[in-house]
Amino acid sequence: MIKYSNLVIPKTKSILKSGCNNNIGYGDRYFFNKLFGSNDASDTHNQPTTKIVTKEMTKELKYPVNQVYSVIIKVEDYKEFLPFCLNSTILKREKDKNHFEAELEVGQGTIKESYVSKVVYKENKFIESTATDTPLFHKLINTWSFKQGQTPNTTIAHCKLIYQFKSPFYATLMENFFASSLDVMINSFDKRCDELYGSSNSFKK
């Protein structure tokens, strides 16, 4: 359930497969879209009015590439250490494939939302997560790339976040959260590496 102040909005899970009719006229989705922005492309009055935002950050971590990659690819563990991740589940994974589907429930304060992402990866090289459908975003893509650091057993990790809200209201509401989201993610993954592989915790620019 999504809550804002005294307003209570029934939460709908954003699991829409290709080819499904998303032009829903009644019910929870209709009410949510009217408040936060419709994802019906046929409605010209509800086309994107918010800007696409890109944030990037590069850090050198004191762990080898395979260890850093191993922590970030385990999406099902995110709920254990990412502050804004309330739940994380693998929905579909095929053997010997370089992709899987995961559902994340994220939130800040009284606002919570679940969405499904398709995660594509190449071992020890990159991980890209794309939200397949969510009532909050027109676009949400998170990409990680990895290479060996300048000293042995270190990793240069580059994180890129691209997002576009469906509603100016929600963009304003979540602006401060997303402004610090990369710092939060990278520091959380660094601490997770400490828990699994070591005891010290530091970043080098």
From Swiss-Prot:
Pfam families linked to this entry: Polyketide_cyc (PF03364)
Superkingdom of origin: Eukaryota
Membrane topology recorded in Swiss-Prot or TrEMBL: Peripheral membrane protein
Disulfide bonds: none
Gene3D superfamilies: 3.30.530.20
Keyword flag Mitochondrion: yes
GO molecular function: ubiquinone binding
One of the record's GO cellular component terms: mitochondrion
Gene Ontology terms: biological process: cellular respiration
Subcellular location: Mitochondrion inner membrane
Keywords: Membrane, Mitochondrion, Mitochondrion inner membrane, Transit peptide
Primary location: mitochondrion
Alphabetical list of PANTHER family matching this protein: COENZYME Q-BINDING PROTEIN COQ10, MITOCHONDRIAL, SPERM PROTEIN HOMOLOG
Subunit field text: Interacts with coenzyme Q.
Family note: Belongs to the COQ10 family.
Reported function: Required for the function of coenzyme Q in the respiratory chain. May serve as a chaperone or may be involved in the transport of Q6 from its site of synthesis to the catalytic sites of the respiratory complexes.
Protein's name in the database: Coenzyme Q-binding protein COQ10, mitochondrial
